[in-house]
Amino acid sequence: MKTQLAILLITLVLFQMFSQSDAILGEIWKGIKDILGKRGLNDLSDLDELFDGEISKADLDFLREIM
C-alpha cells in the first residue's frame, strides 16, 4: 500500500511539473515573438507554400487505381 501511494504521489508531482513547464515555455515563446515582432516572423509564412492544395489528374488517376 505504501508503494502504491508513493507511486501515485510521484506521478502527481511529475504531471504538475509538466503542466507548469508547458505554461512557462509558452510565456517564453510569447516574449520571443513580442521581441521579434511581425517583421521578424514573416519568414515563417513561407512554410505555407510547401502545401499545394490542388489535386492533379495524375493524383486522381492514382486514387482511382487504389479504389
From Swiss-Prot:
Modified positions (Leucine amide) in chain numbering: L36
Signal sequence region: 1-23
Residues excised as propeptide: 40-67
Domain of life according to the entry: Eukaryota
Subcellular location as annotated: Secreted; Target cell membrane
Tissue specificity as recorded in UniProt: Expressed by the venom gland.
An example Gene Ontology CC term for this record: other organism cell membrane
Annotated keywords: Amidation, Antimicrobial, Cleavage on pair of basic residues, Membrane, Secreted, Signal, Target cell membrane, Target membrane
Function per UniProt: Alpha-helical and amphipathic peptide with weak antimicrobial activities against both Gram-positive (MIC=41 uM to >82 uM) and Gram-negative (MIC>82 uM) bacteria. It has extremely weak hemolytic activity against human erythrocytes.
Family, similarity comment: Belongs to the non-disulfide-bridged peptide (NDBP) superfamily. Short antimicrobial peptide (group 4) family.
Free-text comment about domains: Amphipathic and cationic peptide with an alpha-helical structure.
Annotated protein name in UniProt: Spiniferin
Species of origin: Heterometrus spinifer (Asia giant forest scorpion)
